[in-house]
Amino acid sequence: MPTKAKVAIVGSGNISTDLLYKLLRSDWLEPRWMVGIDPQSEGLARARKLGLETTHEGVDWLLAQPEKPDLVFEATSAYVHRDAAPKYEAAGIRAIDLTPAAVGPAVIPPANLRQHLDAPNVNMITCGGQATIPIVFAVSRVVEVPYAEIVASVASVSAGPGTRANIDEFTKTTSRGVETIGGAKRGKAIIILNPADPPMIMRDTIFCAIPEDADRDAIAQSIHDVVKEVQTYVPGYRLLNEPQFDEPSLNSGGQAVVTTFVEVEGAGDYLPPYAGNLDIMTAAATKVGEEIAKETLATTAGGAQ
């Protein structure tokens, strides 16, 4: 019986390379292939040195191989994944999508991972979503949250051309996730590209409107519990200080507010530690892949008995 799921990484850029190092440490995932389109790609060269089979001939090469992966992690672009996703599904390959394509349901591990373990395709939403939606979820599971607003500040040098070209998509997708996964009735997302040099690590502020008579101790405890859960796969995720509670005011629209400040320091596997915004995407994707693999391997083992 196999003890690890066979994995292909589609894409050979910075995120794919950082993801590779995380997958190599996994007890549940075995990276076997890296697929790119540039024969001179540094990511493909690194993957070859680490023992993976590589190609610059794209997804069609992977799908033509006699042995197929169980899981594909795709870190290319939205239009590439939208084209490839039906091919993966037809081949019986599960897909974890790190692009904005959103073909399948969006997943935030502490909030809704268990609901989508059998989905053929899951989407990792955005870096801002992975960092902030867990906090909104932590509050909304204790009290009603009529409005939540998140502000994600990331080092400008960590934002590549894809992020810059899709700022509007980032804010819309993250805002929607604050509502549909975080549990807020209305959500808003803002991203700031911080030009500071030396670069600052990712910092996020999460505002949640709450009832005036809310149990503040229960909310604070729920936030701490979720932070600990995120730290199991992103050790550099931490609260900057205790959640801050404010009474209703004109500035808050007459509602009480809890404000949470977090920062995300990357593990430094391939990307620099200040790029916590990218690290949390690869770490969360690895976590999702591991849980899918555990579930799949357990089901396979049960069926074999």
Swiss-Prot record:
GO molecular function: acetaldehyde dehydrogenase (acetylating) activity; NAD binding
SMART domains: Semialdhyde_dh
Keyword set includes Cytoplasm: no
Superkingdom of this protein's organism: Bacteria
Keywords (A to Z) from UniProt: Aromatic hydrocarbons catabolism, NAD, Oxidoreductase
Residue positions binding NAD(+): S12, G13, N14, I15, S158, A159, G160, P161, G162, T163, R164, A165, N166, N277
Catalysis: reaction(s): acetaldehyde + NAD(+) + CoA = acetyl-CoA + NADH + H(+)
CDD domains associated with the record: ALDH_C
Gene3D superfamilies linked to this entry: Dihydrodipicolinate Reductase, domain 2, NAD(P)-binding Rossmann-like Domain
Keyword Calcium: no
Signal peptide: none
EC number(s) given by UniProt: 1.2.1.10
Active site: C127
NCBIfam families in alphabetical order: ac_ald_DH_ac, PRK08300.1
Family note: Belongs to the acetaldehyde dehydrogenase family.
Protein name: Acetaldehyde dehydrogenase
Taxonomic source organism: Mycolicibacterium paratuberculosis (strain ATCC BAA-968 / K-10) (Mycobacterium paratuberculosis)
